[in-house]
C-alpha cells in the first residue's frame, strides 16, 4: 500500500508485499489483524474511501481474477477480509435481483471503472 503526500509531492510505502505476485494473508473473514494482507493485484481493482476514511478494495487480477473485498482501516493500519473468495476465478452467487442476501457474491472482476 502506498500513500501520496500532495504537499510534499512524494510517495510513502505504507506496507504490504513488493510486486504484483505476493500471495497475501487472508486470515478470518470479518476479523481485522495486523497479519492480514490482500494478495498482489493489478488491472484496475475498484477502490474507494468510506465516510470514516477507511479504504476499500474489490477485485483485480494477477494471473487469476479476484472477487475479494477488503477494508483498510486508516486509524490502525490493518486490513480486514470482508467478503469474497480467497482464491481466484469465482463465478459468484447471484440470488434474486434487487434482494440483499448474505450468500450473494459478485463474480470475479478486473479492469473495473467506477465513480
Predicted regions and their residues:
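Kelch-like beta-propeller repeat domains
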Residues: 1-115
Amino acid at each position: 500500500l502506498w500513500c501520496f503526500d500532495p504537499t510534499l509531492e512524494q510517495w510513502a510505502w505504507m506496507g504490504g508485499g513488493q510486486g504484483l505476485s505476493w500471495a497475501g494473508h487472508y486470515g478470518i473473514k470479518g476479523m481485522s489483524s495486523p497479519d492480514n494482507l490482500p494478495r498482489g493485484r493489478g488491472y484496475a481493482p475498484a477502490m474507494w474511501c468510506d465516510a470514516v476514511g477507511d479504504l476499500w478494495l474489490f477485485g483485480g487480477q494477477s494471473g487469476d481474477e479476484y472477487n475479494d473485498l477488503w477494508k483498510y482501516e486508516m486509524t490502525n493500519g490493518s486490513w480486514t477480509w470482508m467478503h469474497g473468495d480467497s482464491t481466484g476465478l469465482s463465478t459468484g452467487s447471484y440470488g434474486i435481483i434487487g434482494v440483499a442476501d448474505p450468500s450473494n457474491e459478485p463474480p470475479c472482476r478486473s479492469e473495473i471503472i467506477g465513480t
